[in-house]
Amino acid sequence: MKYKNKSPPPNTKFVKYKNNYDELNKESYMKLTNTLLSTGALVALGLGMTLTTTTVHADSVTSTAHESIYHLTTKDGWSNDLQTIAWNSKGNYYDLYFLHSKTSDDPNEAGDQNWYHTTTKDFVHFTPQNEAIKADGPEAPYTWTSAWTGTVLVNNGQIAGVPKGAQVAYFSGLEKHDGGSQNIWGAWSSDNGKTFSHVLNGASPVIDHSWNFTSHNKVDERDPSVVYWHGKMLMYVAEGNEIGVYQSHDGIHCSKADPHGASKVGMGTYLRGINTQDSTPVECPALRTMKMPNGKTKQVLFFGAKAPHAGQTTGTYYIVGHLDQNGLFAPETDAKRLDQGSDYYGANFSGSSNLAEASRAIKSMGWVGNWSYTANGIHNDESANSAFTKHLGSYSVARNLELGNDMSIKSTPIVGQGKEVKHYNSVSKDHPINGINASSNRPFTNGRDTNGTIYNLLDVPSLSVNKLYNLHFYNTKSSYRGRIYIDIWQGNDYVRLNYDPSNGLYNVKTRSGELDRGRNGQAASSYYYDGLLGNGNGYIADSGVKNQHSVDLKVLTDKNSVEFFFPNGQSYTVARFNTNQKQDFKIFTEDPTNGNKVDVTQANLSQN
């Protein structure tokens, strides 16, 4: 994907959850809100913060102001969607491709987007980036002027005019000579996937939006996912509220996969079980075959979407099922979020492009961003006085994805060896860890919530932002009772988690001054702050982890992101935009049984 306009189009407008609960299950909405968002919790955790602020003014496309420390970040300009995570058998590494623009202060300017490429063997260390597909195609009647999202796969011998074993990229883009219509092109590589300079089909599209069997709305024709299936190639293409499905025997000439039907996967199929009102557009589809522990194999359809009337902003979803006789996806489950956070989008996946080959585990990474604020101008200071940054674009840590026998996916983060490891064991309300260098154990409280007083457990300021936290919460008497609160502050910006282990529900709230006075005024800043609950309340999600004697949470922080991982493999990713290299990390809890404790392990992470 991406939008050629300076702001997301009108059909990406989100409706505030708080104003639309009457259109949802009212009982469920009220239960969620009343359970997690008591007045005490919303007020208490904003008190007693030790804040550090740094003003940074950076205006270079290679500025380090918004550069992550251990997450993959574009070397310059702007980046968003991942294209493919493909194993390179010749080089013994993974090829990664992602969308790139010249500058992040206006990343959606038509004609600016190209592909960047890097490689990795361990998803911790990445090689220097290079341009893989140029923003402008070769001069031809129907060439492209901006390269958007697509797929890379190895030619198995059936793609016409391409050497067997060569990598081939299928990608969407904007047509150069007709004002920017969306179509699909192809190109192949003669340097083992580093660049794609040999264009297929005379630089004419292999899928054209204007054909009578392609996009019904004659606008959206992007993000092709190409796989091998039963001796032919299938292409899944994002087409507004549908996914078009096409077949080809030579990789150039395409037709409907279902010759007697519309050959579309509709919203009621790929978002089965979720309220689909205001959920267009679908983007970035990807098909993989995965094997469950019981030996059975299933096709998994991943895609980007949103479900505002289910309380979900844009994110990455998956649904499990199989392909029918024509290659159209048939669901066997309801759709689920792969990551429950607001900023895991434009994701892609390893695994075989041959659907006959099943993977027990695949790897995934997502763009840390949200089109409702990330592309609308980010300042380099909390007071939002600087010019918009010209360098922005980071990705989540890679995750191992495994499909369980219940047809749910478990996500496990891949991180490097931590350094400067510190352990704090048996931390309790009576023996907390506080102060600079963890030098104090003076207890204090921080207001009240549903289950009583909120107690401090850990409050250590001015730590480096590149941290791994392993948090083992437990109760010495029974199941863990009482809320768990994690507050992470960069200057005056924050990410705050409020988790209830008794029912598994949690709330995440955020604030970033760098989003103020954006290209669309305060709209982007307000969306980041309000979420879909409104009034600064962010989002509510269900972790599925409840009534446990102990709970293990993993928290990964870097300059541009925070990632929470629950023990059942559920995750929540959120972007942040402060340029400060330091953060304050705080843990609070209720303790109605007088038995709650936490063991804390923290370490620094880097790409070195």
Where do the PLM segments sit?
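Carbohydrate-active catalytic/glycan-binding domains of CAZyme proteins
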Residues: D59-G595, Q602-Q607
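Low-complexity intrinsically disordered segments
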Residues: K6-P9, M30, T50
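Bacterial N-terminal signal peptides that target proteins for export
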Residues: E27-G40
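Sec-dependent signal peptide cleavage junction
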Residues: L47-T64
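Eukaryotic endomembrane contact-site and trafficking scaffolds
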Residues: M1-V15, N19-N20
